[in-house]
């Protein structure tokens, strides 16, 4: 069965490891085995792709870096082979304000929060208090 596996993408937090924790030894051994069998291994995360994500393999003492990273839930993709990050067109702050103004009744009723990412800066803010 393992011979058929060509690519593996795994979420980081609470999948490969507990938040900010080292990888369990069994996970390290499994990833090394897949890497030795030439399986392309990547990370998938809701976070923006930064140098921290690009060096997770060494941080976790795998002996190799991940082949690719899917960031911002698909909004960014890093290809190690090309050493290039591809990004989707993101909404501008002005476009975001327009959409959120339209949705304000729901936002206020449900007490919705939003995760805004960009330029390697991540802020969690309450839309009704901080953005509009």
Model-derived segments and spans:
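Short, Lys/Arg-enriched, disordered terminal segments
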Residues: 1-5, 36
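A generic hydrophobic-segment detector
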Residues: 4, 131-132
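Asp-based phosphoryl-transfer active-site loop
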Residues: 4-21, 43
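Active-site phosphate-binding/coordination module
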Residues: 27-130
């Amino acid at each position: 069965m393992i011979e058929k596996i060509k690519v593996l993408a795994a979420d980081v937090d609470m999948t490969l490891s507990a938040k900010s924790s080292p990888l369990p030894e069994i996970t390290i051994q499994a990833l090394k085995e897949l890497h030795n069998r030439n399986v392309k291994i990547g990370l998938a995360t809701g976070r923006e792709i930064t140098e921290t994500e690009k060096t997770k393999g060494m941080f976790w003492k795998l002996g190799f870096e991940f082949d690719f990273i899917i960031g911002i839930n698909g909004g960014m993709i890093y290809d190690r082979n090309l050493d290039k990050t591809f990004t989707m067109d993101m909404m501008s702050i002005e476009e975001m304000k327009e959409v959120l103004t339209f949705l304000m009744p729901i936002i206020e009723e449900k007490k919705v929060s939003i995760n805004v990412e960009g330029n390697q800066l991540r802020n969690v803010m309450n839309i009704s208090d901080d953005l509009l």
